[in-house]
């Protein structure tokens, strides 16, 4: 397994010290110094003034002035630094460091999907203080349904944390499909009845709060960048396989959405001319071969009619159980999906050359999709002359991880609003 650079990890941990990228991106160097100080302190959890000054290449006097202003405004606080073990016996005043004041503001992240909605609240330090998931009654919804569900979810999670809406600085919402982040519009979503919806404006008007919306795969990528394996990586790609296939890309420690903001739609890249029908209405998309509805469609050839449930999850579990029991037709369905996934991953490597690919999503419980021969096929399909094989890691999944990424997007926006 090591020769194929395949690792299984649970990458998002609430207890990780600090949050956010541990390296400064090119864009961050262009932001106001107070914001840069906040980013460095938040990333390290607790850090000495002198270390912040060195990382930002500013003078001690400038750092003292900046930290004093941020302390007076309630954004950071002084805290005792733990001495190195060799200095435990030293006398004198313990060294003083800086830490983020968690109560300076709260941010809410929400994932809306066709089966369930989830929410996470972060304090200003990026610590998770609450989470909640709710099942969805109807799969297809109107924009007003989405607004109503979002507001109800926010009210419910605030009750569980004893916070008021006035404590919240910003909200971010993720949905699958084509999302114009800059314009705040949902161009297409598989469970929304309308297209080209100004969802950000609808939510802001209803919530009376600053709102950001984004494609849910981007939010999963932000979760890795802020809380997971991406914190210490300059560039990487995240590929998710659930009800659809999504992708997020980080370059120079920043999430990239494409030149016009609608890129990284790996699931709708074409892998077969006039191929299988995708839920987007076109044929030959990668998603149409490896997403859950694609596997269910193929399952009709392997399962008896009585075994095919209206519940996608139950049908897939039955198909998987048969494959594990040695049924060759069931195994062939997963094997075929794995080959298409290998093709898609090879295209990611060829186009973007990421330092690593992080695979996530509920469908990864089916190891046939990422077993050794799948990763070997990915490397075989990649132009490898002089190229080190790209590592592939299998990461944790679950609705709360997506919502935590949304909360990171909201926290990033809240920081811009507060540190101006």
PLM region spans:
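Glycine-rich phosphate-binding loop and adjoining helix at the ATP-binding site
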Residues: 128-161, 165-172, 177-235, 369-380
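Glycine-rich phosphate-binding loop of actin/hexokinase-like ATP-binding domains
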Residues: 232-290
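ATP-binding/phosphotransfer module of carbohydrate and carboxylate kinases, centering on a glycine-rich
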Residues: 1-94, 99-131, 139-166, 286-420
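General beta-strand structural signal in soluble alpha/beta enzymes
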Residues: 78-79, 211-215, 249
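Short secondary-structure boundary segments
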Residues: 175, 241-243, 292, 361-362
């Amino acid at each position: 397994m090591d020769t194929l650079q395949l690792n299984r990890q649970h990458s998002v941990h609430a207890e990780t010290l600090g949050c956010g990228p541990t390296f400064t991106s090119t864009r961050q160097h262009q932001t106001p110094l107070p914001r840069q100080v906040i980013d460095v302190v938040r990333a390290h959890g607790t850090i000495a003034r002198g270390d912040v000054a060195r990382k930002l290449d500013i003078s001690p006097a400038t750092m003292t002035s900046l930290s004093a202003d941020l302390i007076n405004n309630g954004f950071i606080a002084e805290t005792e630094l733990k001495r190195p073990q060799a200095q435990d016996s030293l006398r004198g005043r313990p060294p003083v460091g800086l830490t983020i004041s968690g109560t300076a503001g709260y941010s809410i992240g929400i994932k809306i999907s066709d089966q369930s909605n989830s929410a996470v609240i972060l304090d200003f330090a990026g610590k998770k203080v609450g989470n909640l998931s709710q099942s969805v009654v109807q799969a297809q919804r109107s924009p007003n349904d989405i607004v109503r569900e979002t507001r109800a979810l926010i009210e419910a999670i605030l009750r569980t944390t004893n916070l008021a809406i006035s404590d919240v600085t910003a909200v971010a919402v993720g949905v699958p499909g084509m999302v114009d982040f800059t314009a705040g519009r949902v161009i297409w979503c598989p469970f929304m009845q309308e297209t080209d919806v100004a969802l950000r404006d609808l939510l802001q008007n209803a919530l009376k709060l600053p709102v950001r919306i984004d494609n849910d795969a981007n939010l999963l990528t932000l979760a890795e960048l802020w809380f997971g394996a991406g914190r210490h990586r300059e560039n990487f790609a995240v590929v998710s396989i659930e009800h659809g296939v999504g992708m997020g890309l980080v370059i120079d420690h920043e999430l990239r959405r494409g030149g016009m903001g609608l890129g990284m739609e790996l699931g709708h890249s074409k892998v077969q001319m006039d191929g299988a029908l995708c839920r987007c209405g076109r044929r030959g998309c990668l998603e149409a071969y490896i997403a859950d509805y694609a596997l269910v469609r193929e399952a009709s050839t392997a399962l008896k009619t009585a075994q095919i449930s209206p519940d996608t999850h139950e049908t897939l579990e039955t198909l998987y159980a048969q494959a594990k029991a040695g049924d060759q037709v069931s195994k062939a369905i997963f094997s075929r999906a794995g080959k298409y996934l290998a093709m898609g991953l090879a295209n990611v490597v060829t186009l973007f050359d990421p330092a690593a690919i992080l695979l996530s999503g509920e469908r990864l419980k089916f190891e046939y999709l990422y077993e050794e021969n799948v990763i070997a096929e990915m490397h075989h399909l990649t132009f490898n002359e002089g190229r080190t094989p790209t590592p592939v890691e299998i990461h944790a999944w679950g609705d709360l991880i997506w919502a935590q990424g949304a909360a990171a997007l909201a926290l990033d926006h809240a920081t811009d609003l507060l540190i101006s």
